[in-house]
Amino acid sequence: MSTVNVQIGLHELLNGSNAQIQLSVPQLVEKVLMRNEGKLTSTGAVSASTGKYTGRSPKDKFIVKEASVADKIAWGAVNQPISEEHFNKLYTKVLEYLKEKEELFVFKGFAGADRNYRLPIQVINEYAWHNLFVHQLFIRPTEEELTTHESEFTIVSAPNFKADPAVDGTNSEAFIMVSFEKRIVLIGGTEYAGEMKKSIFSIMNFLLPEQDILSMHCSANVGEEGDVALFFGLSGTGKTTLSADPNRKLIGDDEHGWSDNGVFNIEGGCYAKCVNLSHEKEPQIFDAITFGSVLENVIINDQTRIADYNDTTLTENTRAAYPMHAIDNIVLPSVAGHPNTIIFLTADASGVLPPISKLSKEQAMYHFLSGYTSKLAGTERGVTSPQATFSTCFGSPFLPLDASRYAEMLGEKIEKHDAKVFLVNTGWTGGEYGVGKRMNLGYTRAMIQAALNGELAKTETAKHDIFGLEVPLHVPGVPDEVLMPEQTWADKAAYKAKAIELANEFKANFKKFDSVSEDIINLGGPIA
């Protein structure tokens, strides 16, 4: 199937009598309720369920193996190839399926808040609530922009169309396929709305580096003096909590680009976790869930329609989608200058990493490539032990290119703009999980504040004898003994053994990066 034929098929779909284009938020909410796709909550948000797929389905994600990208993609378990033949046949079937629908919903908008680098996109949805979701998550065009909008990438989403693995070359009924040549994302068999968000992020992670822009899975905020901070970290490290600062304005909570102009948000909204959400813990998120917001897999009281954020009956991965302007303390448009400070967050359950360390350029590249944190594996008896987990560049499921490409760009930009990089451990202190305790949040906030205001630049440091990290000896508001992890352990020999064990896990994980420079390995990693 040629690109021309693909465009003809799209044109027919978009010009069919069933296509509802660029409906407003109230119109979409009406459609959701009329079509029985979701419920209205007590705060005016729409609540919808995603069925059996309550999270991303990485084994069902494919990139079409086309001549123009075949030698650029880092093929493997993350970037699984699928043939053009399989894609073309499935695409044709999905289009025929959607043509028969009574209604389709189309959103036109952008990815990328910097007008110089934004990607015009359109999303064709089988579900009205999915269209409301993308309306809130991506960047909404003005009426004037809409008149000249020409989409460069299209998502076609048909959750109720199920693939046949034997015929379609998929691994299950669900599929998320990206064709860079035809500029199409094809999604079916899954109702999880996050697939649309992350597909565009994966595309931007391919397109932006081609323009010498580093795409990043991080949150970002800016201080009153215009100083920009980035927060990288996997789930459970405190990225959302620590980047929400009343004295700093939010640029974005999840996806950013770093160009020669500075930092920009890729999105126009937030997709926040809301398990155990409360007004006391996270007032910004709680208050943003109003009319037009979308709740995913949150249990709602049948009578009062009040959301129960503590109920994880459907999944722990409950989510809320809302536009950036639903939060008070933000920058709009979501662009800012070059980062002054970069924070890598890790929740080290082995309790051996320092609570804060200063990183050299090589160490920053090493820890960026490593993307380390811990996850806790539970047993039926409730006995838990920490497991090291590594997610390259703090976002491996979304990186189509070789990881070293992103790391090299980070190193270049750190050097060019003199950004200060810190590794912050929000995990355990005084022993590993089960012996020690979680790092005091007040101490972590004080350490990050000291990093942001430049105090750590002039603080005396000591080199960690196993990880080679420069550890500050004094941080205002933090007891000195907390800063050196070994001092918080009663059993010093046990600390050393555990630290060497983690250092070896770092080294073992790093063996997969065969294309990185020797400097990153020799100057960036553990020294023992």
Swiss-Prot record:
<feature type="binding site">
    <location>
        <position position="217"/>
    </location>
    <ligand>
        <name>Mn(2+)</name>
    </ligand>
</feature>
<feature type="binding site">
    <location>
        <position position="254"/>
    </location>
    <ligand>
        <name>Mn(2+)</name>
    </ligand>
</feature>
<comment type="function">
    <text>Involved in the gluconeogenesis. Catalyzes the conversion of oxaloacetate (OAA) to phosphoenolpyruvate (PEP) through direct phosphoryl transfer between the nucleoside triphosphate and OAA.</text>
</comment>
<keyword id="KW-0067">ATP-binding</keyword>
<feature type="binding site">
    <location>
        <position position="319"/>
    </location>
    <ligand>
        <name>ATP</name>
    </ligand>
</feature>
<comment type="similarity">
    <text>Belongs to the phosphoenolpyruvate carboxykinase (ATP) family.</text>
</comment>
<feature type="binding site">
    <location>
        <position position="198"/>
    </location>
    <ligand>
        <name>ATP</name>
    </ligand>
</feature>
<keyword id="KW-0464">Manganese</keyword>
<dbReference type="InterPro" id="IPR001272">
    <property type="entry name" value="PEP_carboxykinase_ATP"/>
</dbReference>
<feature type="binding site">
    <location>
        <begin position="233"/>
        <end position="241"/>
    </location>
    <ligand>
        <name>ATP</name>
    </ligand>
</feature>
<dbReference type="GO" id="GO:0046872">
    <property type="term" value="F:metal ion binding"/>
</dbReference>
<dbReference type="GO" id="GO:0005524">
    <property type="term" value="F:ATP binding"/>
</dbReference>
<dbReference type="Pfam" id="PF01293">
    <property type="entry name" value="PEPCK_ATP"/>
</dbReference>
<feature type="binding site">
    <location>
        <position position="282"/>
    </location>
    <ligand>
        <name>ATP</name>
    </ligand>
</feature>
<protein>
    <recommendedName>
        <fullName>Phosphoenolpyruvate carboxykinase (ATP)</fullName>
        <ecNumber>4.1.1.49</ecNumber>
    </recommendedName>
</protein>
<dbReference type="GO" id="GO:0006094">
    <property type="term" value="P:gluconeogenesis"/>
</dbReference>
<feature type="binding site">
    <location>
        <position position="198"/>
    </location>
    <ligand>
        <name>Mn(2+)</name>
    </ligand>
</feature>
<feature type="binding site">
    <location>
        <position position="198"/>
    </location>
    <ligand>
        <name>substrate</name>
    </ligand>
</feature>
<comment type="pathway">
    <text>Carbohydrate biosynthesis; gluconeogenesis.</text>
</comment>
<keyword id="KW-0963">Cytoplasm</keyword>
<dbReference type="GO" id="GO:0004612">
    <property type="term" value="F:phosphoenolpyruvate carboxykinase (ATP) activity"/>
</dbReference>
<dbReference type="GO" id="GO:0005829">
    <property type="term" value="C:cytosol"/>
</dbReference>
<feature type="binding site">
    <location>
        <position position="217"/>
    </location>
    <ligand>
        <name>ATP</name>
    </ligand>
</feature>
<feature type="binding site">
    <location>
        <position position="56"/>
    </location>
    <ligand>
        <name>substrate</name>
    </ligand>
</feature>
<keyword id="KW-0312">Gluconeogenesis</keyword>
<dbReference type="InterPro" id="IPR013035">
    <property type="entry name" value="PEP_carboxykinase_C"/>
</dbReference>
<keyword id="KW-0456">Lyase</keyword>
<feature type="binding site">
    <location>
        <position position="444"/>
    </location>
    <ligand>
        <name>ATP</name>
    </ligand>
</feature>
<dbReference type="InterPro" id="IPR008210">
    <property type="entry name" value="PEP_carboxykinase_N"/>
</dbReference>
<keyword id="KW-0479">Metal-binding</keyword>
<feature type="binding site">
    <location>
        <position position="192"/>
    </location>
    <ligand>
        <name>substrate</name>
    </ligand>
</feature>
<keyword id="KW-0547">Nucleotide-binding</keyword>
<feature type="binding site">
    <location>
        <position position="319"/>
    </location>
    <ligand>
        <name>substrate</name>
    </ligand>
</feature>
<dbReference type="InterPro" id="IPR015994">
    <property type="entry name" value="PEPCK_ATP_CS"/>
</dbReference>
<keyword id="KW-0210">Decarboxylase</keyword>
